[in-house]
Amino acid sequence: MTQRPDCYYCSKHQTGEDPPPGGWLVADEDWLVGHGPAHMSLPGTLRIESRRHFTDFADMTDAEAASVGVLLARLYRAVRPVTGAERIHLLATMDFQPHFHAWLYPRAADEPRRGTAFLDQGFECTDAAAEAAAAAIRSQLAPATREGRG
């Protein structure tokens, strides 16, 4: 697996430092998924991180591209009932950390801002709220595994 010693994500995956609130929700061959850091997340915000070092969708292997689609579907199904989100926004820029990672931001129906205005507002929640959301999302993900849906 390709890793770069100067990369924040590669380093944290190797050392186990800076774990997500509530721990990893998904840890498979290609992906790690955890709740986003509380200081930049709404409760239920998830961050998907590639285990292999690459920058964007164009750099994915065919297997990674296929698996991320299945993973996203599972995550959307788990986040929506926990957060009550009307929409879940997917954001992946890699501008600050050039290692593939994507954010899932749940947007409530009563949130007046839409699209990029919603994403531009900045988010923050407590560590306790992030950990509680992670636990609830973990319980939503568990039945999908038992039923063979992912």
Residue ranges, per PLM feature:
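HIT superfamily nucleotide-processing domains
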Residues: 1-150
